[in-house]
């Protein structure tokens, strides 16, 4: 078996599209998100659906050619690890000055093209999200970057990572730290099934006349 072939789909993929698993000393399956744990590994497509299928169909034992113990909530365990990694990197980006929060500052970062990605708390009101989305569309219309937006965490978790309270909207700014955050948010979003592809939405509206009005 190719060492970068998903044990569920049997298809090869880039490592960023896969999650590596190894067997620990206690014969338990362990997710290796950093791909640096010793021992033989197997690979699963990097989304919850395929991880759950691998566990349910006993595919880990088949891949490792020995009986292994699969944690009952392996899918949830991987989700938690990805979320913790994303929030930890977000906190580091804040310390590096690469995050702003608050609707006004976020909108300004979008319109200036400084924002790399947007984070909305799960509790974010539709009106606040809509205003920032208008700014994103207008930025694309004027030839600026298409900025992705994610709604992956509740306000309490965003606030804890960013050292603030009532953090509903945040912008991660273009920088090395911002790129590291983006990589982890993309991985978490993919694992959870992916957000609606608003990049396509942004491209579709880029030529609309009313997009220019959003800038005003």
Q: Which residues fall in each region the model found?
A:
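Extended interfacial segments that mediate partner engagement and assembly in macromolecular machines
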Residues: 49-128
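Helix-rich interaction surfaces within compact, conserved domain-sized segments
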Residues: 149-203
């Amino acid at each position: 078996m190719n060492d970068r072939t998903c044990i569920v789909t049997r298809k090869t993929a880039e490592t960023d599209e896969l999650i590596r698993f190894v067997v620990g000393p206690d014969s338990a399956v362990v997710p290796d998100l950093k791909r640096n744990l010793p021992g033989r590994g197997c690979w699963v497509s990097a989304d919850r659906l395929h991880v759950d299928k691998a566990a349910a169909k006993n595919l880990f034992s088949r891949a490792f050619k020995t009986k292994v113990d699969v944690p009952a909530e392996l899918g949830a365990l991987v989700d938690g690890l990805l979320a913790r990694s994303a929030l930890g990197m977000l906190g580091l980006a804040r310390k590096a000055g690469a995050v702003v929060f608050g609707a006004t500052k976020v909108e300004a970062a979008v319109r200036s093209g400084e924002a790399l990605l947007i984070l909305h708390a799960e509790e974010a009101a539709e009106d606040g999200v809509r205003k920032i989305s208008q700014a994103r569309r207008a930025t694309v219309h004027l030839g600026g970057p298409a900025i992705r937006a994610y709604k992956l965490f509740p306000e309490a978790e965003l606030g804890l990572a960013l050292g603030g309270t009532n953090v509903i909207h945040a912008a991660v700014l273009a920088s090395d730290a911002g790129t590291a955050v983006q990589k982890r948010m993309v991985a978490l979003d993919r694992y959870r099934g992916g957000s609606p592809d608003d990049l396509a939405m942004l491209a579709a509206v880029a030529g609309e006349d009313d997009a220019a009005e959003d800038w005003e």
